[in-house]
A protein has these predicted regions:
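A conserved acidic beta->alpha catalytic loop
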Residues: 346-354
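Acceptor/aglycone-binding surface of glycosyltransferases and processive sugar-polymer synthases
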Residues: 365, 369-386, 403-486, 513-532
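Conserved N-terminal segment of class I S-adenosyl-L-methionine
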Residues: 1-165, 175-179, 242-243, 255, ...
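S-adenosyl-L-methionine-dependent methyltransferase catalytic module, highlighting the catalytic core
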Residues: 172-183, 190-295
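Short, acidic, metal-binding catalytic loop of nucleotide-sugar glycosyltransferases
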Residues: 332-340
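N-proximal low-complexity "stem/linker" segments adjacent to membrane-targeting elements
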Residues: 298-333
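Short beta-strand-to-loop acidic/aromatic patch adjacent to the donor-nucleotide binding site
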Residues: 389-398
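Hydrophobic helical membrane-anchoring modules
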Residues: 4, 272, 276-287, 296-311, ...
Length: 562
């Protein structure tokens, strides 16, 4: 077994997942993209914190680069038609976000995706270490391909699209690669990542026979961890779908024959009987396409808040959707002496939320697509942390919670008495008098009683959206792995309490009116069921310690220097 080392992604502890059959570093031929023979890899270790599967046997840095430079894949172009169809499908997904401009393909191989992109009007550049593949791209296809690793590549013009397709798993520093590629994006540009998912159902069912376990794969990132790393770079995820590959039907049959022992013989017969022209496009749901946008903050021409010069910086985060009517009143209530910055996250509203917010002094990040209440929090918290906030307060843009209470919300944190503060409508229990429907009041009470038992707490409610966090606490929990839906609120509670954080409640009034509370009964029922699911996972994790949401954060949300 290989000597255990710290995880390359989060520095967590590694444990053996798959025993390898090869105790020696592979030769260059083992790195060919078309080679997917199982059982030729070294020991595969999985991080107990972020779940990344890594192969410590492989060399790193320049030594790894040299192996790729010497690598030849003479079989690659035998499936050129299918590979071009696969590239076309990927470009369809990219084109739905960015329809033109400069495109960089990192690890472009023989240049098939670049050639397809050029035919669609993109201005293309490729990076490829393999001398033979890069030569084919330049001399046969006439493409601009440079033989340089991504960490050494710089371009002052920037790119509208950066593609990392079937590349991230080959790199010994995937975090550095994501950071470098994000830095190459122009404002509004997208990073498209395609990589196998070791946390997928197919990967777990296939076990050691999974196609992702091959000699060339240095780091295999679970879907949730990859999303976390992208969001921690300030990127906004807009697409997360299974990858569709196109190959000849014969190749599909022969590939399955290698992995499905009991039915190998009939599959091999089928592979031999199929005509060469037959092709098939399939998604096995064990490889993802994730597209993330660089969305810059739109700054208000006349900011409502300015840096106060206080020892601690307080940032307000306002998730918003169709909040044109309520923003003016919310802004009017914000005490300007209590915070340094207010950032509204517009979840692709259909009204004038963004323009109204800017006109009233709020900075704005606008999602390219509607993603959900939890997604708005993730975007806002991540941006505030990257900008150096010390305390972050969520203030709803719909006016449901009183912005005038921001000083009371942040005081326990600034005084060192709390890591998280929640504004509770139940401490004085005037919720019904404030307009809360009785069925919501009853559901709140029942769920809170169950949660107190599961969490071992005695809080008056868990279902308030008025919350304040210390930056230190938020950076210590993997909230970027949480749901984009309403259950985000309960997942982050589980994460906070699993850390043993200090939670203080502050009484707040209840405000219910049409714009402030649009959650209907079916949505509330779904939320309740999801909350019970969170509690179940929390209780089980205390015994087994396997829930990724309660593990160490992988994304670095430290303040970025200008």
């Amino acid at each position: 077994m290989a000597t255990q080392t710290a995880c390359r992604v989060c520095a967590g502890e590694l444990s053996l997942r798959v025993v390898g059959s090869n105790g020696h570093a592979p030769l260059a031929e083992a790195f060919a993209p078309s080679l997917h023979e199982t059982g030729r890899h070294g020991d595969l270790l999985a991080c107990v914190e972020c779940g990344t599967v890594q192969q410590p046997l492989l060399p790193a840095g320049d030594e790894l680069h040299e192996l790729y430079r010497d690598m030849r894949d003479d079989a690659y172009l035998g499936e050129e038609a299918g590979r071009r169809a696969t590239a076309a499908h990927l470009l369809d997904l990219i084109g739905a976000q960015v329809g033109g401009g400069r495109l960089l393909d990192v690890g472009c191989g023989h240049g098939l995706l670049l050639d397809e992109a050029r035919s669609r009007g993109y201005e293309t550049v490729g990076l490829e270490l393999s001398r033979s593949a890069a030569r084919h791209a330049r001399e046969t296809l006439g493409l601009d391909v440079r033989e340089a690793p991504v960490e050494d590549f710089a371009d002052d013009e920037g790119f509208d699209v950066v593609v990392l397709a079937d590349v991230l798993e080959h790199l010994d520093d995937p975090v550095g690669a994501v950071q470098g590629c994000a830095g190459l994006l122009r404002p509004g540009g997208v990073l498209c990542v395609v990589t196998p998912d070791p946390s997928s159902v197919i990967a777990r069912l296939a076990g050691r026979r999974w196609w992702g376990f091959v000699p060339a794969h240095a780091c295999l990132l679970p879907r949730a961890t990859l999303r976390e790393l992208l969001a921690a770079r300030g990127l906004v995820i807009s697409t997360d779908v299974p990858f569709v590959r196109s190959f000849s039907a014969r190749r599909w049959a022969s590939g399955l024959a290698e992995r499905l022992g009991p039915v190998r013989a009939p599959l091999e017969w089928l592979a031999g009987a199929l005509p060469d022209s037959a092709s098939l496009s399939l998604a096995l749901y064990d490889e993802r396409v994730i597209i993330a946008h660089r969305i810059d903050v739109q700054h208000a021409p006349q900011p409502l808040l300015r840096h106060r010069g206080a020892a601690a910086t307080v940032a307000l985060v306002l998730p918003a959707y169709n909040a044109t009517r309520t923003i003016p009143d919310v802004v009017a209530e914000i005490p300007v002496e209590a915070a340094d910055r207010a950032l509204l996250v517009d979840d692709d509203s259909h009204d004038d939320t963004t323009s109204v917010a800017l006109a009233h002094g709020l900075d704005v990040i606008r999602h390219p697509h509607n993603r959900g209440y939890g997604a708005g929090q993730k975007t806002g918290y991540a941006r505030a942390l990257l900008d150096g906030a010390d305390v972050i307060v969520m203030v709803h843009a719909d006016g449901q919670y009183a912005p005038g209470l921001v000083p009371e919300m942040v005081a326990p944190i600034l005084e060192g008495r709390a890591d998280m503060v929640i504004g509770s409508r139940m401490l004085r229990d005037r919720a019904i008098a404030g307009g809360m429907p009785r069925w919501k009041w009853l559901g709140n009470r029942m769920l809170t009683a169950i949660e107190n038992r599961a969490f071992g707490m005695a809080l008056s409610e868990y279902h308030t959206g008025y919350r304040a966090f210390s930056a230190q606490l938020l950076r210590s929990i993997p909230f970027l792995r949480n749901s984009d839906d309403f259950v985000f609120d309960q997942q982050i509670f589980a994460q906070v309490l699993a850390r043993g954080a200090r939670v203080v409640e502050v009484p707040i009034p209840t405000r219910y009116f049409r714009e402030a509370s649009s959650v209907d009964l079916p949505t509330s029922i779904r939320y309740g069921v999801q909350t019970l699911g969170v509690l179940g996972r929390f209780v089980i994790d205390r015994r087994r310690g396997r829930w990724p949401l309660l593990r160490r954060a992988a994304g670095d949300l430290g303040a970025q220097r200008p």
